[in-house]
Amino acid sequence: MEERNLDLEARNEDIRDKFHTNVVRFELDQIMQHFDEAIQTINAQFVVADELIESGKVNEGENIWRAQIIFLASALDFYMHELTKYGLCEIYNENWDRTDKYENLKVNMKVIEVALKSGEDIDWFLEYINNYYRAITMISYESVKDQFKLLGINLAHIADRAFYQREGTERTKDKFKRRLN
């Protein structure tokens, strides 16, 4: 019987042109609208989960609840990424105050070359932000806190608006942290 050759062939790499898409920058009201729509979709599934559980399909209802947690985290992550993109562009355009974290962003030479060739065009900056933050998940307290600091957003103010309760004993920042973690 003839022996088969099971050696692996070297594979060609980097032979296709990279796919390039234009980075979209939403306005604040659009970012909020997308977030609100995601929350409404998540809330609508509570009715479905409740109906399943009431009809004896407990596992199916609980699966919807688990999926809602993932969808909620995804909605927050999208919101934070878009807020970051929006805020950094506002800082870049000098509409918002610069922050220490903004001034210390790491930019490699390839990005600088593109920026210099782009003139007044801001697309290079949007692409840089998108590439820099795309692998970072922004759903933990620490990541949200870091993004707020980068953008000059007062975390205590946000926590107070979201979680203040008259005669409450827990600090609003601690509640904020507990909810995200």
Please give the residue ranges for each predicted region.
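Charged alpha-helical initiation segments
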Residues: 1-70, 82, 87, 94-95, ...
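Helix-loop junctions and short alpha-helical segments
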Residues: 71-72, 79, 84-181
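Structural signal for well-ordered, non-membrane alpha-helices
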Residues: 43, 76-77
